């Protein structure tokens, strides 16, 4: 190596490699330094072309003077000279290879008892050949001691344990199975650190060296988390951990033969720490909650949770059941009391109620897709009949006289016009749903009854209410259109701050037309395409653009009436009980003035019953008297009937 490079060249090479001269000859280190230096001095890396050529030239000259340092070359050369095993050439090569080695040992060993093979003749040397390989005298490795440990829990405990292998479910109770020596350590560690055992340590008498530990933790954990924690203290000893699904039965089973309690942190546990055996199998009835939400037509998750929470109170002393005013309570309290008690114990109350609400929305969607609009309106009338049964019960503050006062107020709203015919025409427009013939415009001065009538129609047909037509409110309202029969857009403004009502409504021309389906969005749900429902638009005396005027089939002009204003002011019960905004008022108006054949056949029985009840309590003379009082701006509820009903 020194003969290829001069002293000066060697020093120059080590300088380029940035190595001290003491490392000259340490070829592996010089090789690494060479590769590193090539990256530094290479022209493409910003180095010098002259230094790069000088480094490579010196290193190549040094490398040529060295013998082959790769063992792979020797191995490949040696392998090429050895013939294939099992051939006559290999036998000849093997004899030639071993001819200079004398492995004979003139020595005798005492024969052990377990040796079965005969000793070879001492006079002949042992020849190492493929046919007679030499016997090794090395000490064989010791076999690992076989641990006779169980792989699973005792069979009599399996019915109380979870057999899930790959599960992320968290549990509060676990059973740990390990050796008797590790039990005391684990019991103390579980008490001090991660987990807190509430009770007991039990001796398994089938071998008396394996012991289960039954623990309950403050919070829920995965089985794998408990196993990993215990495994840190059981590197040699076996450990089995399983979740407990029947806590109290397992505890009782471990307290009797063939088990015995060694130690427990709380003595003589009772069922209060667990679910009772008869209650363990009981769960919240999701179907019952879904059926309840469907019966009361509740699509608000928080309202449903609140209503169902009221069922937890005892039935005998419930004031709402005694008053019998809220049908969504007193009709279902007794039936759902027990299920409401179990609902308060679970953590996924919102999930359960959300599923029930989704079921209501799904039912509405199916009804909209399969039922005709006549059938939908008849179903709405049927629900209003149920409401009338409740609010006109014996314990209610409502009276038929109040509703008749509301009827005569509506009949005097448009002098010279039949309000019954006007209402029937409006309902016919909503039911027929003809494109560009489906929206009505209520316009007029302030405080003339536009919103009052529109709200009553809204409650009669089951509509959605849009106030002022703000853009953000329209976006929210679009998500609520699903399942609606009609729409009310109220207080549409123009040229007044903020004054964007007409502009926003003008952007909904396709919605108002009803000729094509439009996309309706709801949060967290996909877009739904449907015909936008018909409806009513209320507005003050503003200019309506032509693009909107052509989409209104009728325009009702409201005018201020002093006698209507005074009558409403003096008849306080109409405002206090919101009689005029109640759809039941318009329904009773139709029942009172229309023939039985004008109604759908499915509800004619209820119409006949209510017509008889109204005629029996309100005579024709009483009705005419109430109407005259309204025209004169006086108290319009029949005083005689009202006092008689109050005395009762």
Swiss-Prot record:
Motif mapping: Nuclear localization signal: 140-147
Cofactor(s) in the UniProt record: Mg(2+)
Phosphothreonine modification, residue list: 139
Residues found modified as Phosphoserine: 112
PTM (free text): Phosphorylated on both serine and threonine residues. Small t antigen inhibits the dephosphorylation by the AC form of PP2A. O-Glycosylated near the C-terminal region.
GO cellular component: host cell nucleus
Cofactor binding mode and count: DNA helicase activity requires Mg(2+).
Single GO MF descriptor: DNA replication origin binding
Protein's recorded name: Large T antigen
